[in-house]
Design a protein with these regions (language model features):
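Short, structured coil segments at secondary-structure junctions
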Residues: 1, 127-128
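Hydrophobic packing within well-folded, soluble alpha/beta domains
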Residues: 5-13, 22, 109, 125, ...
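Conserved positions in beta-strands of structured domains
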Residues: 14, 20, 46-48, 90, ...
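Glycine/charge-rich catalytic "coupling/switch" loops of P-loop NTPases
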Residues: 53-55, 59-110, 131, 141-170
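Long, well-ordered amphipathic alpha-helical subdomains in the mid-to-C-terminal portions
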Residues: 104-113, 117-124
Length: 170
């Protein structure tokens, strides 16, 4: 049995890697959306920079990017440009301890559907025209029609070039 997976699109190899690397470090939006269930969420944003700090402006809500992920300066070419932000469902949560840990990475979203999966709940959310899925604890109080505040783990944010769909930050 092999230890690498080949991800292809239209007969063209996109990435060859271990399952974990495909999941954690996808080379483009296709691979990011292909690996994982539910698939990665993609949100429209604009990359901004204030001093040495980068963030993604999602239309008023700004998700700051950790310094250790941006220190190489590779994002400078994208400042002021539209990007796609990727975040996996398990890296979005409404649990109080998670919220307290990520106070600067929060936004309000509308719960379209709350789906009990047994050991977890999938929240299908709408945020400023973007659809998102959050994988939360079965103790979540969020229900259909609610506006819920959720937080992101900024260390798990991915950025993609909006034109080429190639990864610019994992």
């Amino acid at each position: 049995m092999g230890d690498r997976i080949v991800v292809m699109k239209d007969g063209i190899i996109q990435q060859v890697d271990t399952p974990q690397n495909l999941y954690d470090m996808p080379c483009n939006m296709f691979v990011a959306g292909f690996i994982g269930s539910p698939q990665m969420n993609f949100l429209d944003g604009t990359l901004i920079k204030k001093g040495e700090l980068y963030g993604i402006d999602l239309g008023g809500d700004v998700i700051p990017l950790p310094k250790e992920k941006t220190a190489d300066g590779k994002l400078d070419a994208y400042v002021g440009k539209k990007v796609k932000m990727g975040i996996r469902p398990e890296d979005i949560d409404d649990e109080p301890e998670f919220m307290a840990k990520h106070t600067d990475c929060q936004l309000d979203a509308q719960v379209e559907v709350s789906e009990m999966m047994g050991a977890e709940i999938y929240l299908y959310l709408e945020y400023k025209g973007n659809k998102m899925t959050a994988r939360v604890a079965p103790t979540s109080k969020a229900r259909n029609g609610d506006t819920v505040r959720v937080a992101f783990d900024p260390h798990k944010v991915h950025l993609f070039d909006i034109e080429t769909e190639q990864t610019i930050l994992n």
